[in-house]
Amino acid sequence: MTGREILHKMKESVKEKVGLGASASSADSGKGKSKMLKQITHGFHLVKGKAFHEMEDYVVAKFKEVDDNELGLFAIFDGHLSHEIPDYLCSHLFENILKEPNFWQEPEKAIKKAYYITDTTILDKADDLGKGGSTAVTAILINCQKLVVANVGDSRAVICQNGVAKPLSVDHEPNMEKDEIENRGGFVSNFPGDVPRVDGQLAVARAFGDKSLKMHLSSEPYVTVEIIDDDAEFLILASDGLWKVMSNQEAVDSIKGIKDAKAAAKHLAEEAVARKSSDDISVVVVKFQ
């Protein structure tokens, strides 16, 4: 085994230990649970799509102790024309969020600032990371009581409350932000048979990276806070490989009867494949009960 192969194997081992999941193989999965409230569990599952490139979906799913607090850190990063940028986000975005001095007092502001700092760094490192980009949806569960969700792009977060699906993210579609894009000097294409695209290229209006389009794109996240009470049953984070073929309520209904979070995530991914999704698919499920 060469030195390069040994280093690669060490990196993959570290990723598995800290709860990161991403692979060029056909499927990858994992699970974990809170030490604070053992009934809160998480599971994830990834399936590579049919495109002839490396897997571009990356996942974070882990619990982390910070001083006397416990944080659940969950994320989906869906790359486009890049696996380096979602991989970078896996390693650095939560780290940057938690570095913000006002995180505990004002998590929404801290997250917005960290998203901006992280995107700026990605653009500065374009020679190394490439000129592609990535969507993101992140969820931070603070002491099993408060959930702070942020997103850019079309990776989505949905919470199930008393059997009803409630979106905690916004799909940043180009048509929804057409005025802002045009004010920055860009345009939104609407060709027959195709989705709306920024400058005729990108199907989302907000993303990390995409240096060649950045003047016309935003990386400012939509942020929302949800208190986890007795009504909260579970949370789903997923890339658009799932949401292209399944509505929020269909996804919730599909796993209501599945107690194990990892099995629930796998079921959703497999159902998306059965519905002819050809994209990379990544799913995180967090069970609150």
Swiss-Prot record:
<keyword id="KW-0378">Hydrolase</keyword>
<keyword id="KW-0460">Magnesium</keyword>
<feature type="binding site">
    <location>
        <position position="78"/>
    </location>
    <ligand>
        <name>Mn(2+) 2</name>
    </ligand>
</feature>
<dbReference type="GO" id="GO:0004722">
    <property type="term" value="F:protein serine/threonine phosphatase activity"/>
</dbReference>
<feature type="domain" description="PPM-type phosphatase">
    <location>
        <begin position="41"/>
        <end position="288"/>
    </location>
</feature>
<dbReference type="InterPro" id="IPR015655">
    <property type="entry name" value="PP2C"/>
</dbReference>
<protein>
    <recommendedName>
        <fullName>Probable protein phosphatase 2C 39</fullName>
        <ecNumber>3.1.3.16</ecNumber>
    </recommendedName>
</protein>
<comment type="similarity">
    <text>Belongs to the PP2C family.</text>
</comment>
<keyword id="KW-0904">Protein phosphatase</keyword>
<dbReference type="InterPro" id="IPR036457">
    <property type="entry name" value="PPM-type-like_dom_sf"/>
</dbReference>
<dbReference type="InterPro" id="IPR001932">
    <property type="entry name" value="PPM-type_phosphatase-like_dom"/>
</dbReference>
<dbReference type="GO" id="GO:0046872">
    <property type="term" value="F:metal ion binding"/>
</dbReference>
<feature type="binding site">
    <location>
        <position position="240"/>
    </location>
    <ligand>
        <name>Mn(2+) 2</name>
    </ligand>
</feature>
<feature type="binding site">
    <location>
        <position position="78"/>
    </location>
    <ligand>
        <name>Mn(2+) 1</name>
    </ligand>
</feature>
<dbReference type="GO" id="GO:0005829">
    <property type="term" value="C:cytosol"/>
</dbReference>
<feature type="binding site">
    <location>
        <position position="279"/>
    </location>
    <ligand>
        <name>Mn(2+) 2</name>
    </ligand>
</feature>
<feature type="binding site">
    <location>
        <position position="79"/>
    </location>
    <ligand>
        <name>Mn(2+) 1</name>
    </ligand>
</feature>
<dbReference type="Pfam" id="PF00481">
    <property type="entry name" value="PP2C"/>
</dbReference>
<keyword id="KW-0479">Metal-binding</keyword>
<keyword id="KW-0464">Manganese</keyword>
